[in-house]
């Protein structure tokens, strides 16, 4: 646990966790405010797509002290409102409808394939609608940093130091690690001279950055 703050375990949340072609909506906060905001966002996305979401916050963000503005409380839904908004929800067996059985277990091969294709269609919908990222001073940048979490905060100071040396350095911060902002990173491959991916690990997100640029620009890693 002596170096737990370092572990930005991108692989664990974005790539790992179990077998099967499943995906986790992964939110990466870079501030204490986002830590709070992403709890609600994570639940909203999970309910919207009926898909697990996870917040990947490293130890630096977890131990940081900053001011936070909490959202206003929302009224609890009544049982009838839940039935209208979430007809799949398990609430016992209310009168007027058949019971809900939530399971992904299918023993018939045709039904199994149908189920898997339905999941993949859902993941494509998430990739289409839910990619989130932040761009800082990227418009005329000669070089690009791609970083998430506390490392993105550190990179903002790096940008200031680079500007003092006359280096045009942009920062692209993925907010969703999945769905990953591959398209926007791909666009920068034709605009910048090089990309650096700083991470608090030995090199994990850099693999997806390299896939996004597809060899069109040099991508290097800096990690601890």
For each feature predicted by the language model, list its residue ranges:
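Short, small-residue-biased leader/transition segments that mark boundaries at the very start
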Residues: 1-5
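Short coil/turn connectors at secondary-structure junctions
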Residues: 7-8, 20-24, 48-52, 139-143, ...
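Short, solvent-exposed amphipathic alpha-helical segments in soluble enzyme
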Residues: 40-45, 70-73, 157-168, 186-190, ...
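Peripheral docking tails and interdomain loops at the edges
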Residues: 195, 199-224
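Conformationally flexible catalytic loops at phosphate/diphosphate-handling active centers
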Residues: 50-135
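Redox- and metal-dependent alpha/beta enzyme cores, enriched for Fe-S-associated oxidoreductases
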Residues: 132-168, 172, 178-184
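Conserved thiamine diphosphate
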Residues: 6-58
């Amino acid at each position: 646990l002596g170096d737990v703050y370092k572990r930005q375990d991108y692989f664990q949340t974005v790539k790992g966790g179990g077998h099967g072609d499943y995906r986790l909506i992964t939110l990466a906060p870079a501030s204490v405010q986002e830590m709070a905001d992403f709890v609600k966002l994570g639940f909203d996305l999970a309910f919207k797509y009926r898909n697990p979401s996870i917040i990947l916050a490293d130890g630096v963000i977890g131990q940081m002290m900053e001011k936070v503005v909490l959202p206003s409380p929302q009224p609890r839904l009544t049982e009838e409102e839940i039935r209208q908004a979430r007809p799949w929800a398990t609430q016992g067996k209310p009168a007027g409808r058949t019971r809900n059985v939530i399971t992904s277990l299918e023993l018939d091969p045709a039904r199994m394939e149908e189920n898997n294709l339905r999941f993949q269609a859902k993941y494509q919908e998430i990739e289409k609608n839910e990619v989130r990222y932040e761009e800082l001073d990227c418009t005329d940048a000669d070089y690009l940093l791609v970083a998430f979490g506390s490392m993105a905060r550190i990179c903002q100071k790096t940008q200031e130091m680079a500007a003092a040396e006359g280096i045009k350095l942009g920062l692209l911060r993925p907010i969703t690690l999945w769905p990953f902002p591959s398209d926007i990173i791909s666009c920068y491959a034709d605009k910048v001279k090089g990309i650096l991916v700083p991470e608090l690990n030995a090199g994990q997100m850099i693999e997806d950055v390299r896939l996004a640029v597809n060899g069109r620009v040099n991508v290097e890693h800096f990690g601890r």
